[in-house]
Amino acid sequence: GNELLEAGEECDCGTPGNPCCDAATCKLRPGAQCAEGLCCDQCRFMKEGTVCRIARGDDMDDYCNGISAGCPRNPFHA
């Protein structure tokens, strides 16, 4: 419950109100793919191609990849 994902944890159990994470075990609840992240929505990975970070300046938007909760940087990141 320290807001860090540590070895053996699938999710951080620091937020008992998180519906995706079992606060007692720090494991994802049955059926959950993720508990947090820019590409996690209602315990599921957002579909590939969903914008997760809007471009700033000369950069380009970043998109979810459909297989993780993180928001990968585009290959042209400035």
From Swiss-Prot:
UniProt organism field: Bothrops alternatus
Keyword presence, Secreted: yes
Residues covered by the Disintegrin domain: 1-78
Source species, domain of life: Eukaryota
Cited function: This recombinant disintegrin antagonizes integrins alpha-IIb/beta-3 (ITGA2B/ITGB3) and alpha-V/beta-3 (ITGAV/ITGB3). On ITGA2B/ITGB3, it interferes with the outside/-in phosphorylation of the focal adhesion kinase (PTK2 / FAK) downstream of the integrin. It strongly inhibits platelet aggregation induced by ADP, thrombin, and collagen, abolishes and reverses dynamic platelet recruitment to immobilized fibrinogen. In vivo, it induces a dramatic increase in the tail bleeding time, and has a strong antithrombotic activity.
Molecular functions per Gene Ontology: toxin activity
Xref: PROSITE patterns: DISINTEGRIN_1, DISINTEGRIN_2
SUPFAM superfamilies per record: Blood coagulation inhibitor (disintegrin)
UniProt subcellular location: Secreted
UniProtKB keywords: Cell adhesion impairing toxin, Disulfide bond, Hemostasis impairing toxin, Platelet aggregation inhibiting toxin, Secreted, Toxin
Tissue expression pattern: Expressed by the venom gland.
Disulfide bond is among the record's keywords: yes
Quaternary structure annotation from Swiss-Prot or TrEMBL: Monomer.
Site residues by UniProt (May bind to beta-3 integrin (ITGB3) subunit): 76
Pfam families the UniProt entry points to: Disintegrin
GO cellular component, one term: extracellular region
Segments carrying motif Cell attachment site: 56-58
UniProt site positions, description: May bind to alpha-V integrin (ITGAV) subunit: 53, 56, 73
Protein's recorded name: Disintegrin DisBa-01
Family: Belongs to the venom metalloproteinase (M12B) family. P-II subfamily. P-IIa sub-subfamily.
Note: Is derived from the P-II subfamily of the venom metalloproteinase (M12B) family. The interaction between the disintegrin and the integrin ITGAV/ITGB3 is inhibited by EDTA, indicating a cation sensitive binding.
Cystine connections: 11-26, 13-21, 20-43, 34-40, 39-64, 52-71
Site entry (May bind to both beta-3 (ITGB3) and alpha-V (ITGAV) integrin subunits), positions: 77
Site-annotated residues for May bind to metal ioncoordinated at the beta-3 integrin (ITGB3) subunit: 58
